[in-house]
């Protein structure tokens, strides 16, 4: 099973996979699973034009652990086997989260690409580790209390304006809230295990309220926002990957203290000074990759741009998409 943000899934020894866009709509008297043994532990019915979960007769699969019904026409969550640990309903027509009361062993739930407006009826799923709501119509982060085993939460592509109500997610490691309407970094105080924050394509204008993540945050993706300065980023002393592409940043000030930085993605900003690259970044001995393409310093010096960056930062292994050979002293 896969999702928008992760390649992880399960591969049980016994499973059924049907992926056929030409399969006709399933009616109550027309069950694709009639010939499937009762003891399978994984069923995948993808692009099968299924409209009703009830018509599948899933109750006879007493050992079913993983159910994937991606890219169908399901409007209602129902008849969910209580033995499930993974449920994938990505890309259906679901408008409401319901009928999960008895599915208490779920560790993975994907409801991405549906029509859900409100997060509800899931805080009893105490074992959830991965939860996905990509591309729905959700306006508010709420009703997640009790999900203290959750490590990965994906809320990208919704209508969320505020990061809130995450205090009980004390084991959260990855938070994805890209492509929303968020204007501010806030309410991270309780997320003491957060190592990755993706907040791309929002309305962020400054780095703020991040000191509480200084010891844990390793990856920060904040491209396509309204940032004009790195001020406030200096508190993230353990940051390893920083993506600020497609903002309006003019200077590299405040980066000199990020001693653990390995990758800096800063394409399509307003950076113009090679001297700043040397002054601010030459002390970052772990820095291996930089992206400066699309900045004035590249557009006004296209022929010598990469060589000048390499002279400023001889430790680099990659400039933009170009890998630097270990024996190379300059670009051709």
Swiss-Prot record:
Residues 295-332 form the LRRCT domain. InterPro entries: Cilia_flagella_integrity, Leu-rich_rpt, Leu-rich_rpt_4, Leu-rich_rpt_typical-subtyp, LRR_dom_sf, U2A'_phosphoprotein32A_C. Keywords: Cell cycle, Cell division, Leucine-rich repeat, Mitosis, Nucleus, Phosphoprotein, Repeat. One of its GO terms (cellular component) is cytoplasm. Coiled coil: none annotated. Gene3D superfamilies: Ribonuclease Inhibitor. Essential for the mitotic metaphase/anaphase transition. Positively modulates protein phosphatase-1, possibly by forming a repeating helical rod that is capable of enhancing a PP1-dependent dephosphorylation activity. Belongs to the SDS22 family. Physically interacts with the dis2 and sds21 phosphatases. This is Protein phosphatase 1 regulatory subunit SDS22. It comes from Schizosaccharomyces pombe (strain 972 / ATCC 24843). The gene is sds22.
């Amino acid at each position: 099973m896969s999702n928008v943000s992760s390649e992880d899934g399960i591969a049980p020894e016994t499973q059924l996979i049907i992926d056929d866009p030409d399969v006709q709509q399933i009616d109550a008297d027309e069950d694709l699973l009639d010939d499937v043994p009762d003891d399978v532990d994984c069923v995948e019915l993808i692009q099968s034009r299924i409209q009703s979960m009830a018509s599948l007769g899933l109750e006879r699969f007493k050992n079913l652990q993983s159910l994937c019904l991606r890219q169908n026409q399901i409007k209602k969550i129902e008849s969910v086997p209580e033995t499930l640990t993974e449920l994938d309903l990505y890309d259906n027509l679901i408008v409401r989260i319901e009928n999960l009361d008895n599915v208490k062993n779920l560790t993975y739930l994907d409801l991405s690409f549906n029509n859900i407006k409100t997060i509800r009826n899931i805080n009893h799923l105490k074992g959830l580790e991965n939860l996905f709501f990509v591309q729905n119509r959700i306006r508010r982060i709420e009703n997640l209390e009790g999900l203290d085993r959750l490590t990965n939460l994906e809320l990208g592509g919704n209508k969320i304006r505020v990061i809130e109500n995450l205090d009980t997610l004390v084991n959260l490691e990855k938070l994805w809230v890209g492509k929303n309407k968020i204007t501010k970094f806030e309410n991270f105080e309780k997320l003491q295990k957060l190592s990755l924050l993706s907040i791309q394509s929002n309305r962020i204008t400054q780095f703020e309220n991040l000191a509480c993540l200084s010891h844990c945050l390793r990856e920060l993706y904040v491209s396509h926002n309204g940032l004009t300065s790195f001020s406030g980023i200096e508190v993230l002393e353990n940051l390893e990957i920083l993506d600020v592409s497609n903002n309006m940043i003019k200077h590299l000030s405040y980066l000199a203290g990020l001693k653990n930085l390995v990758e800096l993605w800063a394409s399509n900003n307003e950076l113009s000074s090679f001297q700043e690259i040397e002054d601010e970044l030459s002390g970052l001995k772990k820095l291996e990759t930089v992206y400066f393409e699309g900045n004035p310093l590249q557009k006004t010096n296209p022929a010598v741009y990469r060589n000048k960056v390499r002279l400023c930062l001889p430790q680099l292994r990659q400039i933009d998409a170009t890998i630097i050979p270990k024996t190379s002293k300059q670009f051709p």
